[in-house]
Amino acid sequence: MSDQQNTQQEDQPFFNIQRVYLKDMSLEQPNSPGIFLESEAPSVEVQVNVAASQLQEGIFEVVVTGTVTTKVQEKVAFLVEAHQAGIFDIRNVPVEQLDPLLGIACPTILYPYLRGNIADVITRAGFQAIHLSEINFQALYEQRLQAAMEEAQAAGGANSGIVMPDGSQARH
């Protein structure tokens, strides 16, 4: 191979999953064993959040956090919080594409692992499995962008400093 071919390959966008792992998980059953005697159907609340951080040049950790709180009447049956993480090698990606990659593609890869781990711990705790529904991380990402733009507008800046997925500056 010539030096020119090597340089061209080195400049190509590169995305690789280095590792997927369960970073943290907790289960609380504050009203057990009495809660198992309740006959009323439980209410379920689910919250999902995404965070990303750069570990070193081109290496990023993305964490998808899921919290499931189940109550019978006003008593908490259980609360599960899990942090499913992944380490991603991302190089030669244009800056305007990096944030959507970290906020959409990486969480989409991690979420099935999070769902499985949460369902497993709930079942092992003696409760009926709760299967979390799919999440459209693109819509979630766009909602966060919109909220950030509205916050910037409220602060009074003409240029929010937010870069849209197409690379343009967000303005109000």
Curated annotation (Swiss-Prot):
Predominant location: cytoplasm
GO CC annotation terms, alphabetical: cytoplasm
Subcellular location as annotated: Cytoplasm
One GO BP annotation of this record: protein folding
Record flagged with keyword Chaperone: yes
Gene Ontology molecular-function annotations: unfolded protein binding
Keywords on record: Chaperone, Cytoplasm, Protein transport, Translocation, Transport
Keyword Magnesium: no
Superkingdom assignment: Bacteria
Family label: Belongs to the SecB family.
The protein's role, per its UniProt record: One of the proteins required for the normal export of preproteins out of the cell cytoplasm. It is a molecular chaperone that binds to a subset of precursor proteins, maintaining them in a translocation-competent state. It also specifically binds to its receptor SecA.
Subunit architecture: Homotetramer, a dimer of dimers. One homotetramer interacts with 1 SecA dimer.
The protein, known as: Protein-export protein SecB
Protein source organism: Cupriavidus pinatubonensis (strain JMP 134 / LMG 1197) (Cupriavidus necator (strain JMP 134))
Name of the gene this protein is made from: secB
